[in-house]
Amino acid sequence: IFHLEAEPTKRLMDFCEKYHISLACLLLMGIRTFFQKENGFDDVSVNNAIARRATLKEKKSGGTRIHSFPFRTCFSKDVRFIDAVYTIRDKQNELFRHANYNPTEYFALRSKTYPQPKAGLTYEPMSLTYQPMTLKEKGLNDLGDIKYKTKWYPNGMTTQAMYLTVMHRPEDNGLDFSFEHQVKAVSRKQLEYMYYYLCKIMFKGAENPELTIGEIIKLV
């Protein structure tokens, strides 16, 4: 787990509020730009996990209602950072309307339509989940300033090379980046490297949203 302090987290949240985007969009932009920087390809896909409990009936249904879909982005280096983020936002809004579709059926269909040379290969290097559990709001004060705590636990089964969960800490509203990974596929050193550049890309983009992706990659 990597911890981002409260003050820099607030800078990211302020950017999201100013430009009317979710932090999930900014995280996805940072991740796909990191892979674009590392691999030199404009076409990057990341699995996006969605906690789908849209109705009261679903909220009380029990069990797991997590759906995962690949989110593909194709941005050349001359695209402005903010324009790419807006594109991600609009495409997410379009995709999430269908988030109740069975992801297992989708991946089975894709494997038949676009077969890989051997089993186990995929287009996506990792998966992302953002848990928007920011409860530092006035509502808690109205209820007597109820204290709460959260903790992230892996379930012991890592079926993919890398899975990132980003959550807010209840004590200061900073961000925790929790990586679940297969140790033979991704090392701790590689995770540190990715986290370092992910943050640099997000902050550079938030500070200079008019810069192009290529300019940000050079600056970080």
What spans do the regions from the language model cover?
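Flexible, P/S/T/G-rich "lid" or insertion loops adjacent to the active sites of thioester-utilizing
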Residues: 1-21, 111, 219
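Histidine-centered acyl-transfer/condensation active-site motif
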Residues: 3, 21-23, 167-190, 195
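His-Asp-centered acyl/peptidyl-transfer active-site segments
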Residues: 15-24, 28, 38-151, 183-188, ...
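Short amphipathic C-terminal alpha-helix that caps PH/PH-like domains
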Residues: 85-92, 191-205
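Residue-level signal for inorganic ion chemistry
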Residues: 99, 164, 191
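Low-complexity, glycine/alanine/valine/leucine- and proline-rich hydrophobic stretches
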Residues: 143-172, 181
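AMP-binding/adenylate-forming catalytic domain of the ANL superfamily
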Residues: 204-220
